[in-house]
Amino acid sequence: LELKDRSGNVIQVREERIGFRTIEFFPQDGIYLNGTRLIVKGINRHSFSVDGGRTTSAAMSRQDALLIKEMNMNAVRSHYPPDEHFLDMCDSLGLVYIDELSGWHGRYDTETGARLIREMVERDVNHPSVILWSNGNEGGWNTDNDSLFCKYDKFQRRHVIHPWADFDGLDTHHYPAYLTGVARFTNGYKVFMPTEFMHAMYDQGGGAGLRDFWDRWMTNPMFAGGFIWVFCDEAPKRSDRGGVLDSDGSNAPVGGG
């Protein structure tokens, strides 16, 4: 994109890669990518590196995205919009992404939320990896602002979700049990896609039963996949402790996950 003055002189240039794909959500059916039903094999990710903590880089984004692909996963979610270089890597490698309004607290007021939604959608709208918008995490939803996603995403109008909620045809209930409620899953009529399940952080072992959970959930024709918590343990290297990795949860220097 070139911006020129009245004399035709180029005064600003911006280059941006784009991609083409279709993404559709059908209630009581599922999510379709380029006309094919999508089962997300997802992971939740925080922006983190052992050496840099919350400081990120394009090299770190590439490393994480490649590792996620090598883990046979195809989808990523975070609690905030990621660095653009991570979305660039998702675009490039074929990973799909849930782009989420920042936070894990209560809902934003309407004015603040509206501003943040506009900033997120206008920045990320051209990334083909973004398949769903998320209006906040675990109770951070302000439904008064839901219509704004389509206002700024007026051509694709990607579906809006509320993680941890059964909302608008998509049940994203967090940490469902193996024998999750009959009404919710076995005899449910909503597309089922837990945006967090099998808490596997800090050696809790939550990921150990993945095969059993996955095989059971795949028996439901409305299962659309899910997102394990979490990609890595977020243990920073402590230069003041001889280089040990400190994963002491919320007591660690960069906070908990």
What are these model-predicted stretches?
Residues 1-70, 88:
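N-terminal carbohydrate-binding accessory modules
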